[in-house]
Protein backbone atom coordinates (compact mmCIF):
# COMPACT_ATOMS: atom_id res chain seq x y z
CA UNK A 1 0.00 0.00 0.00
CA UNK A 2 1.36 3.40 -0.95
CA UNK A 3 1.64 6.34 1.37
CA UNK A 4 -1.34 8.67 0.86
CA UNK A 5 0.96 11.64 0.17
CA UNK A 6 2.74 9.73 -2.56
CA UNK A 7 -0.64 8.71 -3.97
CA UNK A 8 -1.84 12.34 -3.98
CA UNK A 9 1.34 13.44 -5.76
CA UNK A 10 0.98 10.71 -8.40
CA UNK A 11 -2.68 11.59 -8.98
CA UNK A 12 -1.72 15.24 -9.49
CA UNK A 13 0.93 14.18 -12.02
CA UNK A 14 -1.58 12.10 -13.99
CA UNK A 15 -4.29 14.77 -14.16
CA UNK A 16 -2.74 16.83 -16.95
CA UNK A 17 -1.62 13.84 -19.06
CA UNK A 18 -3.83 12.45 -21.79
CA UNK A 19 -3.18 9.25 -23.73
CA UNK A 20 -5.35 7.49 -26.30
CA UNK A 21 -6.81 4.19 -25.18
CA UNK A 22 -5.09 1.17 -26.68
CA UNK A 23 -4.41 -2.42 -25.75
CA UNK A 24 -2.09 -5.26 -26.71
CA UNK A 25 -2.39 -6.07 -30.40
CA UNK A 26 -2.93 -2.48 -31.55
CA UNK A 27 -0.53 -0.94 -34.05
CA UNK A 28 0.86 2.34 -32.71
CA UNK A 29 2.84 5.22 -34.14
CA UNK A 30 4.87 6.94 -31.44
CA UNK A 31 6.52 10.32 -31.80
CA UNK A 32 9.60 10.36 -29.57
CA UNK A 33 11.28 13.67 -28.77
CA UNK A 34 15.06 13.40 -29.06
CA UNK A 35 17.34 16.15 -27.83
CA UNK A 36 20.74 16.40 -29.53
CA UNK A 37 22.75 19.25 -28.11
CA UNK A 38 20.63 22.38 -28.53
CA UNK A 39 18.29 20.89 -31.13
CA UNK A 40 15.23 18.76 -30.51
CA UNK A 41 13.58 16.57 -33.11
CA UNK A 42 10.81 14.00 -33.28
CA UNK A 43 11.59 10.46 -34.33
CA UNK A 44 8.71 8.10 -35.12
CA UNK A 45 8.55 4.47 -34.04
CA UNK A 46 5.78 2.32 -35.47
CA UNK A 47 4.98 -1.16 -34.22
CA UNK A 48 2.60 -3.51 -32.42
CA UNK A 49 1.94 -3.09 -28.71
CA UNK A 50 2.76 -6.50 -27.23
CA UNK A 51 2.35 -5.77 -23.50
CA UNK A 52 1.00 -3.24 -21.03
CA UNK A 53 2.02 -3.57 -17.41
CA UNK A 54 1.84 -1.67 -14.14
CA UNK A 55 -0.60 1.04 -13.14
CA UNK A 56 -0.59 4.70 -12.26
CA UNK A 57 2.68 6.53 -12.78
CA UNK A 58 4.57 3.23 -13.11
CA UNK A 59 2.54 2.01 -16.11
CA UNK A 60 4.61 0.96 -19.13
CA UNK A 61 3.97 -0.55 -22.54
CA UNK A 62 6.17 -2.49 -24.93
CA UNK A 63 6.11 -1.91 -28.70
CA UNK A 64 7.67 -4.33 -31.21
CA UNK A 65 8.53 -3.75 -34.84
CA UNK A 66 10.53 -5.59 -37.45
CA UNK A 67 13.53 -3.45 -38.38
CA UNK A 68 16.17 -3.71 -41.07
CA UNK A 69 17.32 -7.21 -42.07
CA UNK A 70 14.25 -8.74 -40.37
CA UNK A 71 15.56 -8.02 -36.89
CA UNK A 72 12.90 -7.47 -34.24
CA UNK A 73 13.18 -4.26 -32.23
CA UNK A 74 11.32 -3.85 -28.94
CA UNK A 75 11.13 -0.67 -26.92
CA UNK A 76 9.53 -0.19 -23.52
CA UNK A 77 8.02 3.22 -22.85
CA UNK A 78 6.66 4.70 -19.64
CA UNK A 79 3.00 5.51 -20.25
CA UNK A 80 3.30 9.11 -19.08
CA UNK A 81 6.82 9.84 -20.37
CA UNK A 82 7.82 13.39 -21.23
CA UNK A 83 9.72 12.11 -24.27
CA UNK A 84 6.52 10.84 -25.94
CA UNK A 85 5.44 13.71 -28.16
CA UNK A 86 2.52 11.84 -29.74
CA UNK A 87 0.82 8.45 -29.64
CA UNK A 88 -1.43 7.49 -32.54
CA UNK A 89 -3.42 4.25 -32.88
CA UNK A 90 -3.18 3.15 -36.53
CA UNK A 91 -4.94 -0.25 -36.37
CA UNK A 92 -6.97 -1.95 -33.67
CA UNK A 93 -5.96 -5.60 -33.45
CA UNK A 94 -8.12 -8.53 -32.35
CA UNK A 95 -6.18 -10.78 -29.96
CA UNK A 96 -7.11 -13.07 -27.09
CA UNK A 97 -4.09 -12.46 -24.90
CA UNK A 98 -2.91 -9.55 -22.78
CA UNK A 99 0.77 -10.31 -23.43
CA UNK A 100 1.80 -11.14 -26.99
CA UNK A 101 5.29 -12.43 -26.29
CA UNK A 102 4.67 -15.36 -28.65
CA UNK A 103 5.10 -12.92 -31.56
CA UNK A 104 8.84 -12.94 -30.84
CA UNK A 105 9.07 -16.47 -32.25
CA UNK A 106 6.89 -15.85 -35.30
CA UNK A 107 8.16 -14.69 -38.68
CA UNK A 108 6.43 -13.30 -41.77
CA UNK A 109 2.73 -14.00 -42.22
CA UNK A 110 2.57 -16.02 -39.00
CA UNK A 111 3.18 -12.80 -37.05
CA UNK A 112 0.11 -11.05 -38.46
CA UNK A 113 -2.68 -9.85 -36.19
CA UNK A 114 -6.30 -9.72 -37.29
CA UNK A 115 -7.85 -6.28 -37.49
CA UNK A 116 -11.12 -5.39 -35.75
CA UNK A 117 -13.92 -4.79 -38.23
CA UNK A 118 -16.10 -1.76 -37.54
UniProtKB/Swiss-Prot annotation:
Disulfide bonds: none annotated. One of its GO terms (molecular function) is structural constituent of ribosome. The keyword Endoplasmic reticulum does not apply. PROSITE patterns: RIBOSOMAL_L19 (PS01015). It holds the Pfam family Ribosomal_L19. Keywords: Ribonucleoprotein, Ribosomal protein. The keyword DNA-binding does not apply. One of its GO terms (cellular component) is cytosolic large ribosomal subunit. InterPro entries: Ribosomal_bL19, Ribosomal_bL19_CS, Ribosomal_bL19_sf, Translation_prot_SH3-like_sf. GO terms for biological process: translation. It comes from the Bacteria. Belongs to the bacterial ribosomal protein bL19 family. HAMAP family: Ribosomal_bL19 (MF_00402). This protein is located at the 30S-50S ribosomal subunit interface and may play a role in the structure and function of the aminoacyl-tRNA binding site. This is Large ribosomal subunit protein bL19. It comes from Helicobacter pylori (strain J99 / ATCC 700824). The gene is rplS.
